[in-house]
Structures are given as structure tokens and as C-alpha cells.
């Protein structure tokens, strides 16, 4: 393990700044909205919010800033959940419209304390955004809803453009990386149901550097391919604090490029965003989906567009 070791140069990033970044942050504070970008201390926050190649993207975190689960990689606090804010769906939709986003990502904390896992609240937020502007592309990064098919179907029925659910790591490392209530097969089942019950694009993400072996990553890609996942992302795990899971290793950028090639060429995923600083909602994946859906490009053209704009 690499406790105490300096981060390599390729993991250094500039603090977020710029007028666009400041504007978005102020709008979010005015409406008391949360973003996973801030809660998870995402290293790409400034780049995505500032919209270097467009109007910018923010990932809104629904249903509060405290989670019913305690994953050892995640910086979101556990316990002490509050009642849902019934105004949140409208507030998020208004903020999206005011900021001028073309592509918005919605995610949430886990709310195992709620009968439906918060799925109706999630779905209503999607619908409110679509009411404001049907042209806005909506990606949802959903929890597993404890495997409840009705909860998953509520998200499908709301009609987002992408449904993502993260397996996070290989099967062997689900614990200690994820909360014990998370399960590899259950996560695959969520993705499989979306693929079987709809034509909505599916997406998932894996962290590298938590102790996985290459053959386990390869097998995971195979499992994801079998359930019809369209887009996969790889990023470096970074320890949020010393009380979180240790970083096992800092994976070289060349390794990320290798996994990108394997995902796209061997397993035929539509797109793979892969790099040390890539996160699940990293804009390269969003640029790909936007090019594919909005502009009707072929997967090959959409890949080139996303890499050129995303700097991959």
C-alpha cells in the first residue's frame, strides 16, 4: 500500500476557478442544492463546471448530503438523513435551466431508510428537467435501490437518456471498498434490468488502485459486456482522508490507456473514458453520449469528438 507516498505528477490538478465556476457555485448555494462534485471533492470540478468546451456540466446530488451507507472510498457522510425536500425536483430543474446546461447528471445518496429508496423523488426530478427543456440530455447515476425492480422501473419510466450504476471495483473487493449492503451481482442485475427493459444507454465506472488484479478487471469487463453495458469509465482511486480506504497503488496513465483499448476493441463497448483523473461523471463520457444522441454520429465519430474535446 502507498500510505504516505507523494502523489505522482499526473495526479496534480489546479484548484477550481473562473467566472463560470463561480457563477454556478453561487446559483447552487442560492437554492441550497448539493453536487457530488463538491461532496466527493472531485478533481475535475473546475474543468467540468467551467465548461471549457461548452456550457459546462454539474452533477447534482439528490435527497440530501448524508447517506444511509458507508462506503470506505466515499467522502459523503453516513447517517443522520433528513426528510426529503419536496421542492428539490423543481429547484434542480430551475437551476439547470438558469445555468444553461445542455447535459446534466443526476445522482443521489443511498436512502435505504425510504420505502422506495427515493426512486420516485429521483424520477420526478428527471421529469421536472424535461418539462423545462426537452432538449436537455439527462444522465442518472442511480443507487442499487436494494435490487427493487419497481424502483429501477420508476427511473426507466421517467425517460432519462442514460442510466448509470457503478460497480466501483472487481467482485473480490466489493468489501472493503463498498458498504457491506452493496453487492456485485446485485449491481450487475440493476444494469441488466435497464438494458432488458429499455433502449436507454447504460454506463458504469470502476476505480483502479484499490488492490485489483488485471485478470479481475478483465473478467469484470466481460461481466459488464454480458449484461449489455454501453459505456464504462476507469479512474484512479484517491483517498479522501486518512480514515478512508488506503490507496493500494497509483496506476500509470499508460495502464488506463490499455484498459480503454481493451474495453473498446475486445469487448466492443460504445465508449470508454479512462484516465487517472476520470470519474464516473467525467465530461468525456458525457460528450460522447451527447454527440451520439444529439448529433446522430456513429460511435467512431462520437469517440473522436469526445476525445478531442475532453483532452484524452
From Swiss-Prot:
SMART domains: Elp3. One of its GO terms (molecular function) is metal ion binding. Pfam families: LIAS_N, Radical_SAM. [4Fe-4S] cluster 2 binds at residues 67, 71, 74. Its EC number is 2.8.1.8. [4Fe-4S] cluster 1 binds at residues 37, 42, 48, 281. Signal peptide: none annotated. It catalyses: [[Fe-S] cluster scaffold protein carrying a second [4Fe-4S](2+) cluster] + N(6)-octanoyl-L-lysyl-[protein] + 2 oxidized [2Fe-2S]-[ferredoxin] + 2 S-adenosyl-L-methionine + 4 H(+) = [[Fe-S] cluster scaffold protein] + N(6)-[(R)-dihydrolipoyl]-L-lysyl-[protein] + 4 Fe(3+) + 2 hydrogen sulfide + 2 5'-deoxyadenosine + 2 L-methionine + 2 reduced [2Fe-2S]-[ferredoxin]. It is an enzyme of class 2 (transferase). It is found in: Cytoplasm. PROSITE patterns: RADICAL_SAM. One of its GO terms (cellular component) is cytoplasm. Pathway: Protein modification; protein lipoylation via endogenous pathway; protein N(6)-(lipoyl)lysine from octanoyl-[acyl-carrier-protein]: step 2/2. Keywords: 4Fe-4S, Cytoplasm, Iron, Iron-sulfur, Metal-binding, S-adenosyl-L-methionine, Transferase. Residues 52-270 form the Radical SAM core domain. Binds 2 [4Fe-4S] clusters per subunit. One cluster is coordinated with 3 cysteines and an exchangeable S-adenosyl-L-methionine. Its cofactor is [4Fe-4S] cluster. InterPro entries: Aldolase_TIM, Elp3/MiaA/NifB-like_rSAM, LIAS_N, Lipoyl_synth, rSAM. NCBIfam families: lipA, PRK05481.1, PRK12928.1. Belongs to the radical SAM superfamily. Lipoyl synthase family. This is Lipoyl synthase. It comes from Halorubrum lacusprofundi (strain ATCC 49239 / DSM 5036 / JCM 8891 / ACAM 34).
